[in-house]
Amino acid sequence: MKYLDVDGIGQVSRIGLGTWQFGSREWGYGDRYATGAARDIVKRARALGVTLFDTAEIYGLGKSERILGEALGDDRTEVVVASKVFPVAPFPAVIKNRERASARRLQLNRIPLYQIHQPNPVVPDSVIMPGMRDLLDSGDIGAAGVSNYSLARWRKADAALGRPVVSNQVHFSLAHPDALEDLVPFAELENRIVIAYSPLAQGLLGGKYGLENRPGGVRALNPLFGTENLRRIEPLLATLRAIAVDVDAKPAQVALAWLISLPGVVAIPGASSVEQLEFNVAAADIELSAQSRDALTDAARAFRPVSTGRFLTDMVREKVSRR
C-alpha cells in the first residue's frame, strides 16, 4: 500500500474504502450484506493496510456509520475515518450536534476527517465554516474537508475556516477527469488531497460493459452508459485495455493506478465482497510508466460525453423504436 501524510490526519492510504453501499438496498446489498460481508471487508481492508474509510451521515440514514464503527472494532481509533455532514441548516450549533451524533454512531470520540458533503447553494461558507472551526478547536475532529466543491468555493472555504481545508472529495475518474484541470494542481501546490469517489465510473472502466452488454438497475440511468457515450468512450477503453495487458493487470486496476499516480489523489472505491476489495487494493502495487500515464490522461481528456439531455432524448427514442 502507498500512503500520503496529511496534516491533522496522519497516514492516508492511496486506496481507501468507500462505504456508501453499507446497508444500501438500492444497490442490492441490504441487511444481510451489512451484518456479514461488510464486516469481513473492513477487517480484510485493515489487514491489507487500508487506513482511509469514508462514510456519511446520510448513507443509509446513519446505518453506514454504525456498521463501519462496529466492523472496525478496536482499530477505529487507529485509522482515518472520514464522515460527512449534509449542509441543511449548517449553523455552528447544528454542525456540532450532527458531528457528535456521527461520532456516537462510529463509536469515536474524535472523527479524524469531517467533511461538508456538498456546497449549500444558499448558505455561504462564511456561515458554515465557523462550526467546523469550533470542532477543530475543541478537538472533536482532526481536520476539515469538503466534498463536491469547485476550486473557487474550496478557496472560499479556506478563507472562512481561517486554516487549510485539507481535502475535497469529488467525482473523479478517467471517465470524469475534470479535477485534473484545477483541483489536482491546487492540491499539489497547497499540500492538500483530492479524494476520488466513483473512481471506476460505476464499473464502466472495468471493461465489462459496452454496446453489446448494457448494465441493468440504477446503472442504466447513468448517462455514461448511453449508446452515444459508449461509442465515444471506446478509444479510452481501448487505451486502458492495452496498458492493462502491458502491466499484467485488469483495466479497472489500471484506472485506479492512474488516479493514485496523480499528486495528492486518493481513491475510495466501494467493495461488495472481500475479493473485490483485494482486487482494488492490488492497484496500489501497479507502477505506471510516464508514457502510460500520459496516454491515459490524454485519452481521458479527449473523451467528450453527450449532455444528460441528449442521453435522455436518445434513451426515449431507443425505447420507442423497440416497440
Curated annotation (Swiss-Prot):
One of its GO terms (cellular component) is plasma membrane. One of its GO terms (molecular function) is aldo-keto reductase (NADPH) activity. InterPro entries: AKR_Detox_Biosynth, NADP_OxRdtase_dom, NADP_OxRdtase_dom_sf. The active site is at residue 59. Its EC number is 1.-.-.-. It comes from the Bacteria. Belongs to the aldo/keto reductase family. Aldo/keto reductase 2 subfamily. Keywords: NADP, Oxidoreductase. Gene3D superfamilies: NADP-dependent oxidoreductase domain (3.20.20.100). NADP(+) binds at residues 198-208. This is Uncharacterized oxidoreductase Rv2298. The lineage of its organism: Bacteria, Bacillati, Actinomycetota, Actinomycetes, Mycobacteriales.
